[in-house]
Structures are given as C-alpha cells and as structure tokens.
C-alpha cells in the first residue's frame, strides 16, 4: 500500500537469501511435557478437555470447500453426522435432537499438546513473493513467475499440516493457472491462499 517501498521489495527479491524451505521456518516448539505444552491445549484442558470453544467460520471453511482443499480435516472436525459445517458471525452452534454437535469445531490436531507455534514460514514467504510478481511490486509484473511461486507456496502450506503427497498433487493441479486469468483474479487466488494458510495464526 506504500508505493515508496516497491524498490526495497524488488531489491530483496533480487537478492534472495530469505526463508526458502521448511527447514528455515521460524517455529516455537512445544512438547508433551507438563509446563511445556501448547497453551491452546492447556486452555482446552481448563474447560474440561473437550474442544467446543472454537468453531469453523464459513469465511474460512466455504472457500476451502469450494477448492476441495485437503487441509479441511487438518483444520476442522466434522459434525456428528460426518459433515463439515461452518458458522456465520454470531451464529449459534447447531446440534441434532440428541444434542450431538453438528457444527464443525477447530480440529484437535491444531490443539494437540506438542503442536508447534508457527511464527514465519516458507509458504508465507513464497505467497508474498507470488503477490509481488502478480502486482509488479519492485519487479516487472510476471504472472508466470507468480504462478510458480503460488503453487510452491500452496504445496509447502499443505505439507506443513501433514497432507499426503498425492493429495497435494491433486489439489495443486486443480488450482487455477494464474497465467490464464486476469491480474486481479490472480491476486485474488493468491490472497485466498494466504488467508487459508494463516487460519491458525494470531491476528498480529
């Protein structure tokens, strides 16, 4: 949003040397040892050990469903009937006539004891670089380069959550080719993947 930063962005892109693989991820580790467990796990333990505090938002779940995103079961639990259902803002959770939960909660996988806290990642870097090339920020606009970085970023994002390689291949193959859409739509797809990737991150 600050045009004066474009040149600096271009210089960094040309220089390289930034986060370039999962081994470079900035991660705060937790373990299964008491006193060193993920605070999200400890929060759920404080309220009885059942995760019914945090639900799937339709603003996240629906775009993932539209794209057949393989991260859905990593992010959310299905309802008691096996269906993934998100909630709108201020919408109450849905149950069946036996009080079984039908609305999807955030997955126990994300609330496990030793779930690491991801601070900055390879996929975040790749998607930011894809955005820069799609917008022409400090570099010539290049949707082919943006597409390459976008696909790599999505692969890394899925792999971080343990999605099987075959499922990643299927998903990435089905994503739009950014070279075949308008620059505006290319940016939309990049931003959507950034949004999905940051689901389990704090607002800051």
Model regions and ranges:
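Hydrophobic-face positions in mid-chain alpha helices that act as interaction patches
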Residues: 5-129, 134-135, 141-197, 203
């Amino acid at each position: 949003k600050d045009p004066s930063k474009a040149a600096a962005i271009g210089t960094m892109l040309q220089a390289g040397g930034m986060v370039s693989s999962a081994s470079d991820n900035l991660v705060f580790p937790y373990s299964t040892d008491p006193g060193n467990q993920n605070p999200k796990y400890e929060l759920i333990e404080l309220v009885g050990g059942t995760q019914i505090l945090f639900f799937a938002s339709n603003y996240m779940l629906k775009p993932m469903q539209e794209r057949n995103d393989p991260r859905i079961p990593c992010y959310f639990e299905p309802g008691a009937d096996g269906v993934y259902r998100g909630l709108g803002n201020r919408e109450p959770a849905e149950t069946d006539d036996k009080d079984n939960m039908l609305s999807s909660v955030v997955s126990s996988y994300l609330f496990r004891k030793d779930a690491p806290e991801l601070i900055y990642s390879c996929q975040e870097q790749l998607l930011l670089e894809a955005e820069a090339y799609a917008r022409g920020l400090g570099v010539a606009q290049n949707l082919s380069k943006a597409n390459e970085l976008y696909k790599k970023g999505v692969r890394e994002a899925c792999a971080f959550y343990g999605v099987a390689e075959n499922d990643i291949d299927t998903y990435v193959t089905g994503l739009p080719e950014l070279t075949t859409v308008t620059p505006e739509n290319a940016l939309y797809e990049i931003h959507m993947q950034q949004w999905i990737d940051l689901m389990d991150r704090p607002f800051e």
